Amino acid sequence: MLRALSLFVVGVCANLLVGLTAFAQAPAEVTLTRIDCGSGATPTDVGQRFTDTFAYKDLKLTFTFSCYLIKHGDEYMVWDTGFAPGTSPNAPKVGIVDRLKELKVTPEQVKYVGISHFHGDHTGQLAPFTNATLLIGQGDWDQITSPTPMQGANVAGFKSWIDEKRKVEPLALDKDVFGDGSVIVLRTPGHTPGHSSLLVRLKEMGPVLLTGDLAHFRENYESGGVPSFNFDRAATVASIERMKQIAANLKATVVIQHDMRDIGKLPAFPAPAK
């Protein structure tokens, strides 16, 4: 009788342990929501400055400026913060804080803010995320904190992080943000010294690649032409090639953040991609 009871107890404990292990290992639900963070006031003649190979003559495009909210279980990450309202003709009429409010998310709930690079159209609304850890490429952070930052580095956008000594994680390598492979900051230098892109793995849609300014529009991504203002041409070409290989291997959806034609690859706000 005692032996049977002991075996029963052992069996119950084993089943409970298996159940708890399965529960602990259950993947967090991941969603991705695009937030409008500005749009071009006028079309841009991209054949002048956005290629060094004469790849697209007389091509004019209207740029868009995108921010993103990633929900990982009960945790949140923001990717890029666009222009601040009122700071540019391209700035959004509604700021990111108010957009997050529509999603019932406060800035204080955001655990990470990832920045593709230090330009003002990606860093204009950093200040409200007081509890977040800033994820930024090492090369870009070095410029932001340099006594003589390079032209185009939006030092003012990072003022609160520097003055208040907020949490910063400069990235010299790729970063698995939540530790389960679902959200990875990818090193894609070239546009700036520490430029990064983002991989988000979604259960239904599959992997999504957010390019930052690795490429500014589809023709830029496909032709191999490099904007004249990029920091490093060779690094840009290598990073684009890396992105193409990742996209092919993972069968990922590539979202070029400035290309208005790519907005429709994700659900319209406030709906998330899942």
Which residue ranges define each predicted feature?
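Bacterial N-terminal signal peptides
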Residues: 6-19
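Metallo-beta-lactamase
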Residues: 20-105, 109, 160-163, 173-178, 205-212, 248-253, ...
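Short, electropositive alpha-helical surface patch
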Residues: 86-87, 95-96, 137, 190, ...
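Active-site metal-binding motif and surrounding structural segment of the metallo-beta-lactamase
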Residues: 89-136
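Conserved G/P- and acidic residue-centered "switch" motifs that form tight phosphate/ATP-binding loops
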Residues: 80, 117, 191
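Positively charged n-region of N-terminal signal peptides that target proteins for export
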Residues: 1-4
